[in-house]
Amino acid sequence: NFDISILNEFSKPPILTPHTGEFKRFFGNYYDSLCKKKVLTVREICKKFNIYLILKDVDIIIGTPKEEVIVIDNPNRLLSTAGSGDILCGLITGFISQGFSEIESILNAIKIFYTIGNFYLKNNYISYRITDFIDKISYWEDL
């Protein structure tokens, strides 16, 4: 099990990017609440633990330590491909390393993530190799 008390040891709010299964392992006591009231639960957890949370499910729910919540309701089953969450984390980290704020980094990364995912969806892909997804990052605006 994940020891959530470690979240209090960071000097800046950490960014977590769990899908719902990982969420259950991280925040088991909140899982039932999440199933009933996603937005409210994300808001509560982000405030309580001083974190950014990107909950990946059919939709994406982004929560901030300041209790802001953004829902991206643009389902794309192709974005659940193994490894795609790692790409999202890498994109976020890349933006942060360039000096963008956490929320700017998250939103920029999700924009790229969804643009590439939607390219695959619109072109009737049923799957893709994660390396092909990575290759598209350098020209995502042209997709």
Where are these regions (language model features)?
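Glycine-rich phosphate/dinucleotide-binding loop and adjoining beta-alpha-beta core of small-molecule
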Residues: 1-73
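Short, charged, surface-exposed loops that flank catalytic or proteolytic processing sites
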Residues: 32-37, 99-107, 125-126
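Short pre-catalytic strand/loop immediately N-terminal to key active-site residues, enriched for Gly-Thr
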Residues: 70-83
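Charged C-terminal helix
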Residues: 115-143
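N-terminal loops that bind phosphate or other acidic moieties
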Residues: 12, 100, 138
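A structural preference for long, well-packed, hydrophobic secondary-structure segments
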Residues: 3-9, 77, 97-98, 111
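Short, small-residue alpha-helix embedded
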Residues: 25, 81-112
